[in-house]
Design a protein with these regions (language model features):
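Conserved NTPase motor "head" modules and their coupling/switch loops across ABC/AAA+ ATPases, GTPases
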Residues: 1-114, 123, 127, 131-134, ...
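Walker B catalytic acidic pair
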Residues: 118-120
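Hydrophobic/aromatic beta-strand patches that form the interior of the parallel beta-sheet core
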Residues: 143, 161-163
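H-loop/switch region of ABC-family ATPase nucleotide-binding domains
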Residues: 145-148
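Active-site donor-binding loop signature of nucleotide-sugar glycosyltransferases
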Residues: 165-167
Length: 174
């Protein structure tokens, strides 16, 4: 049941993340895949695998096979993003997934969660910054931290509260 739930969740995350990535980046196709080590993901198949490996697991003092070994595989145009994605592509993937998670929370509980973007904008070019800000524009209460306040102009920042820490003192920017 856990594997099926994870697969269903990753399917939804894949769909929404792919849309977000296409909007932010507009280039490659993002695909998320759930990878399990179980050949048979039925309850009986998983139980069978645990029974088969029980003595070995006791001897080794660890569970060798299990859902803890499952993984999320990320691809850009069918290439393993972990091996081939640039730092900018990796940042865009993470942001796409984060925004997708915000949308999933909204779908599940009916309201947006608070979003924290911790120094992520400094690594984006102007176009990607603006697209990210468009995605969260007035929908999501967002805290953006940065060491360099260079967000550029975006209408969603017109009514933003900007706080600056300068020499240990918190100041409000006007």
């Amino acid at each position: 049941d856990l594997i099926q739930r994870r697969m269903k969740f990753i399917e939804l995350l894949n769909e929404i993340s792919g849309q977000m990535y296409a909007y932010i980046s507009g280039k490659e196709k993002l695909v998320l895949r759930y990878h399990t080590h179980f050949k048979d993901i039925s309850k009986e198949g998983i139980l069978d695998k645990y029974k088969k490996n029980y003595k070995r697991d006791i001897f080794q003092g660890t569970t060798v096979d299990g859902v803890h070994k499952d993984d999320l595989k990320i691809f850009l145009d069918e290439n393993d993003a972990g091996m081939f994605a640039s730092q900018g592509q990796q940042r865009s993937i993470i942001l796409s997934m984060k925004i997708a998670l915000v949308e999933i929370v909204k779908m599940q509980i009916g309201e947006y969660p608070v979003l924290l973007l911790d120094d992520v904008l400094s690594e984006l070019d102007e176009e990607r910054k603006m697209k990210l800000l468009n995605l969260i524009d007035h929908k999501v209460q967002t805290f953006i931290t940065t060491t360099h306040f260079d967000l550029g102009y975006h209408h969603s920042l017109d009514d933003a509260l900007v706080l600056r820490i300068e020499k240990g003192t918190l100041k409000e920017d006007k």
